[in-house]
Amino acid sequence: MPTEDAYPELQEEEIDVEAELEKLILEDREAEASTSSGEASAEASQDLSETLKQLQQELEITRQQLKEKEESYIRLYADFENYRRRTQREKEEFSQKERQKFVLEILPVVDSFERAQQQLKLETDREREVHNSYQSVYRLLVECLKKMGVSRMKSVGQPFDPNLHEAIARQPSSEYPEDVVAVEYQPGYKLGDLVIRHAMVAVSSGSPTSEPSPSDPATPKPEPESTPASPQNPQHS
């Protein structure tokens, strides 16, 4: 019976077959491993894609919510600004009305001081003393009104303006042309830019004329002298 060493070519062939078989087995295992790894990679990629898609959806939802919150904040801020401005305006209007009410109560006192000043005759020391006392109080009142934003309007010599003046008379004037304020009976005042009291004035109707007005009585004209009729002579028969 021949031994294994008797057929060395068979031994080499067997070795080659075994080597080839081992190689095929190794390749098969690598292929299986590669296939398994590819499947795992595909599954991981699919999971990652789904996770990314979900995160994108959540990000879009978050962005939409943020946009809604921003719009809500803008509306709330605008409402607050409107409320603040309205409150400030109402506060200023109330303060303006209160100042106007106070000034209108003070102005008659100022008028009284000015009338007294015009009527007072400074002939004695007592009269001058009273005048100085009046003037001190008058100056305090005027200064107080100035600090509140009150100013006296100039009327005489100004064109008549119904927004500033109240005409109570119309009279001829040699100094001022027609429709110009000629006399001021009571001064007008402003509180800031607001007219709080119109000036009571007389408006010029133009230069006076020497022609008699229609109401003047007409001067009777002299009648022509009549010639007396001569008496008739009686007829004698």
UniProtKB/Swiss-Prot annotation:
Gene name, Swiss-Prot/TrEMBL: grpE
A biological process from GO: protein folding
Disulfide bridge map: none
UniProt KW keywords: Chaperone, Cytoplasm, Stress response
Locations listed in the record: Cytoplasm
GO MF annotation: an example: protein homodimerization activity
NCBIfam families for this protein: PRK14140.1, PRK14143.1
GO CC list: cytoplasm
Protein's UniProt name: Protein GrpE
UniProt-listed InterPro entries: GrpE, GrpE_coiled_coil, GrpE_head
Quaternary structure annotation from Swiss-Prot or TrEMBL: Homodimer.
Family: Belongs to the GrpE family.
Segments for region (Disordered): 27-51, 202-237
Comp. bias intervals (Polar residues): 227-237
First-listed, main subcellular location of the protein, grouped into a coarse class: cytoplasm
Bias (Low complexity): 33-45, 204-213
Superkingdom field: Bacteria
Physiological role: Participates actively in the response to hyperosmotic and heat shock by preventing the aggregation of stress-denatured proteins, in association with DnaK and GrpE. It is the nucleotide exchange factor for DnaK and may function as a thermosensor. Unfolded proteins bind initially to DnaJ; upon interaction with the DnaJ-bound protein, DnaK hydrolyzes its bound ATP, resulting in the formation of a stable complex. GrpE releases ADP from DnaK; ATP binding to DnaK triggers the release of the substrate protein, thus completing the reaction cycle.
